[in-house]
């Protein structure tokens, strides 16, 4: 259709000297090579930025001398005023929000202002909304982040996780999916999978689907780490996976198209989607923290997003220092409230006709995770919806498994009793039992694997992982289910500065972390070359760190940047066999 894939554009680059010279409050800059103007607002360590261009008629902003707080700028054309600390126009009030630019520091301590180009790709080839017949567009909630969309004579499914756990054994479904879920998947014309996390890319679910429809079209974004990077290892036979570029309409038929967008301005892992049918847009931001670099379409017909929080091991799995139970409880309460308010503000700003909170309906149901379940409180979708309704006219929908929203009816008359059809009375909503054993058996199979008879697996694995030249020492301790040392398990140090494995901590000054991991999960992860989200997001570790610093480079590497193929354990074992038996045998494959 003549569209061009979105790219990340550097609008302005400030040197370390210029960064050090930034003053508190408003800073004006011009890119001398392009002649474009920008505003940077500094509040202690926080930076916000935007183009120096009024949204009204493109006028230039200057300092507002009437603003003693030093937060607002004034347009030279019509005296419109923008509060740069909030990116909201204050004169006239409640008029616009200024589009914000992404601020990043690069490896050379330069400050970059970034934007996706084109920034609003959905505006290309625009379509005017047509009237929808009743029943023409129906959205049925299945469970967690899985929606079944009927769009005319086509069916589309989002993120099918319908059976089994996610993140090793840490997450289980809160809601009981409709009994016909597999039939619904098989009848779909296409499936969208937002990202590689196992509560969205569920291989147990896809294995069931592949047994009946291995050629079902599945669409994913062109992320740096492929969504299906582990397909061959999974053993699931899917033959029609389509990787599509970001920001380009994908035409399904004359009435239906969709566009996949990245999270932030770098296509690392997460994506979101706009589905458009007869000009009516459905926006699903899934788990994105800054979808499309913060630019999203306004006044869509239906918006859905995550809401719950709790999708991280922090702070529940941490101990020592400040991590008392009281501190954790207060932190969790504060963070959940911040997330709730952020989602409510986002919905208020975007003004969709209808909003649906989803993608947060999981529970830590295995008995061994009782502490996590009790500590890791989630947001209540009804509380969010009530907050939204207080501040806007947006219609809200808290979905239950099998409930169906008729978009045509709801857009015409939100009070129509047939606009949302709830599941039949007596339908089971919440799961009360989970089939743990088959999935735990898969994990337990790794514990006795021959690989772990040779202590040299440690060097082999971390060499394969490829993370080094970073001043961090980590102690890895294998544990039982209750995080007590596993009898006969490994307890070792890794020094990532030179990728060595010392018997004692080095004498130099160094940050230090202790990671206690359930033996079945860590060995399953090591054996199969899986990402450490299985451990961290799955609550399969207990951590201590000194000092209390988050080592982004370390965790980002093990959560997203590990090699795409697992370690060559076959070659490793052959080497060990050739060099003779012995649990302490040192081996290195070539």
Swiss-Prot record:
EC number: 1.14.18.2
InterPro entries, sorted: CMP-Neu5Ac_hydroxylase_Rieske, Cnh, RibonucZ/Hydroxyglut_hydro, Rieske_2Fe-2S, Rieske_2Fe-2S_sf
Cofactor(s), by name: [2Fe-2S] cluster
GO molecular function: 2 iron, 2 sulfur cluster binding; CMP-N-acetylneuraminate monooxygenase activity; metal ion binding
Domain of life: Eukaryota
Keyword Electron transport: yes
Chief localization: cytoplasm
Reactions this protein catalyses: CMP-N-acetyl-beta-neuraminate + 2 Fe(II)-[cytochrome b5] + O2 + 2 H(+) = CMP-N-glycoloyl-beta-neuraminate + 2 Fe(III)-[cytochrome b5] + H2O
Residue sites binding [2Fe-2S] cluster per the record: 54, 56, 75, 78
GO cellular component: cytoplasm
Pfam families xref list: Lactamase_B_3 (PF13483), Rieske (PF00355)
Cofactor info, note text: Binds 1 [2Fe-2S] cluster per subunit.
Pathway per the UniProt entry: Amino-sugar metabolism; N-acetylneuraminate metabolism
UniProt domain Rieske: residue ranges: 14-112
Keyword Oxidoreductase among record annotations: yes
Subcellular location: Cytoplasm
Record keywords, A-Z: 2Fe-2S, Cytoplasm, Electron transport, Iron, Iron-sulfur, Metal-binding, Oxidoreductase, Transport
GO terms of biological process kind: CMP-N-acetylneuraminate metabolic process; N-acetylneuraminate metabolic process
Disulfide bonds: none
Function: Sialic acids are components of carbohydrate chains of glycoconjugates and are involved in cell-cell recognition and cell-pathogen interactions. Catalyzes the conversion of CMP-N-acetylneuraminic acid (CMP-Neu5Ac) into its hydroxylated derivative CMP-N-glycolylneuraminic acid (CMP-Neu5Gc), a sialic acid abundantly expressed at the surface of many cells.
PANTHER family: CYTIDINE MONOPHOSPHATE-N-ACETYLNEURAMINIC ACID HYDROXYLASE, INACTIVE CYTIDINE MONOPHOSPHATE-N-ACETYLNEURAMINIC ACID HYDROXYLASE
Family per record: Belongs to the CMP-Neu5Ac hydroxylase family.
Name the UniProt record assigns to this protein: Cytidine monophosphate-N-acetylneuraminic acid hydroxylase
Originating organism: Pan troglodytes (Chimpanzee)
């Amino acid at each position: 259709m003549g569209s061009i894939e979105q790219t990340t554009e550097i609008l302005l680059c400030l040197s370390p000297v210029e960064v050090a010279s930034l003053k508190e409050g408003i800073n004006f800059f011009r890119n001398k090579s392009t002649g474009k103007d920008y505003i940077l607002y500094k509040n202690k360590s926080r930076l916000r930025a935007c183009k120096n261009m009024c949204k009204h008629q493109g006028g230039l902003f200057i300092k507002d001398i009437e603003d003693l707080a030093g937060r607002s700028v004034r347009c030279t054309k019509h005296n419109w005023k923008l509060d740069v600390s909030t990116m909201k126009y204050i004169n006239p009030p409640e008029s616009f929000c200024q589009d914000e630019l992404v601020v990043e520091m690069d490896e050379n301590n330069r400050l970059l202002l970034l934007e996706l180009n084109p920034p609003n790709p959905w505006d290309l080839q625009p379509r005017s909304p047509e009237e929808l017949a009743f029943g023409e567009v129906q959205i049925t909630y299945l469970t967690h982040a899985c929606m079944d969309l009927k769009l005319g004579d086509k069916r589309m499914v989002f993120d099918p996780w319908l059976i089994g756990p996610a993140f090793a054994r840490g997450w289980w479904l809160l809601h009981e999916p409709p009994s016909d879920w597999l039939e619904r998947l098989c009848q779909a014309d296409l499936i969208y999978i937002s990202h590689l996390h196992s509560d969205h890319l569920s291989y147990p679910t896809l294995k069931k689907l592949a047994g009946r429809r291995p050629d079902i079209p599945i669409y994913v974004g062109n992320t740096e780490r492929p969504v299906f990077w582990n397909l061959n290892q999974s053993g699931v036979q899917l033959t029609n996976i389509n990787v599509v570029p970001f920001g380009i309409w994908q035409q399904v038929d004359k009435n239906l198209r969709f566009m996949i967008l990245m999270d932030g301005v770098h296509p690392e892992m997460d994506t979101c989607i706009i589905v458009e049918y007869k000009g009516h847009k459905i926006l699903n931001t899934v788990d994105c923290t800054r979808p499309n670099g913060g630019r999203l379409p306004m006044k869509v017909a239906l918006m859905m997003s995550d809401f719950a929080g709790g999708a991280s091991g922090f702070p529940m799995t941490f101990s020592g220092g400040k991590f008392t139970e009281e501190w954790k409880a207060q932190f969790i309460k504060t963070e959940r409230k911040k997330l709730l308010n952020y989602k409510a503000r986002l919905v208020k700003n975007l003004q969709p006709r209808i909003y649906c909170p989803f993608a947060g309906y999981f529970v830590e149901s295995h008995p061994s995770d009782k502490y996590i379940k009790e500590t890791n409180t989630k947001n209540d979708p009804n509380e969010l919806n009530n907050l939204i309704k207080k501040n806007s006219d947006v219609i809200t929908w808290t979905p239950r498994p099998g409930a169906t929203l008729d978009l045509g009816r709801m857009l015409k008359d939100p009070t129509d009793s047939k606009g949302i059809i709830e599941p039949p009375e007596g339908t089971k909503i919440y799961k009360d039992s989970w089939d743990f054993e088959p999935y735990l058996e898969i994990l337990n199979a790794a514990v006795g694997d021959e690989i772990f008879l040779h202590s040299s697996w440690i060097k082999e694995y971390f060499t394969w992982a490829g993370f080094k030249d970073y001043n961090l020492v980590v102690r890895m301790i294998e544990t039982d289910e209750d995080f007590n040392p596993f009898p006969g398990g490994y307890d070792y140090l890794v020094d990532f500065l030179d990728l060595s494995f010392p018997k004692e901590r080095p004498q130099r000054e160094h940050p230090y972390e202790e990671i206690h991991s359930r033996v079945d999960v860590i060995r399953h992860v090591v054996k199969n070359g899986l990402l450490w989200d299985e451990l961290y997001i799955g609550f399969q570790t207990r951590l201590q760190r000194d000092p209390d610093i988050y080592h982004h480079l370390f965790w980002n590497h093990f959560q997203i940047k590990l090699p795409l193929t697992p370690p060559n354990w076959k070659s490793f074992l052959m080497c060990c066999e050739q060099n003779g038996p012995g649990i302490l045998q040192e081996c290195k494959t070539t």
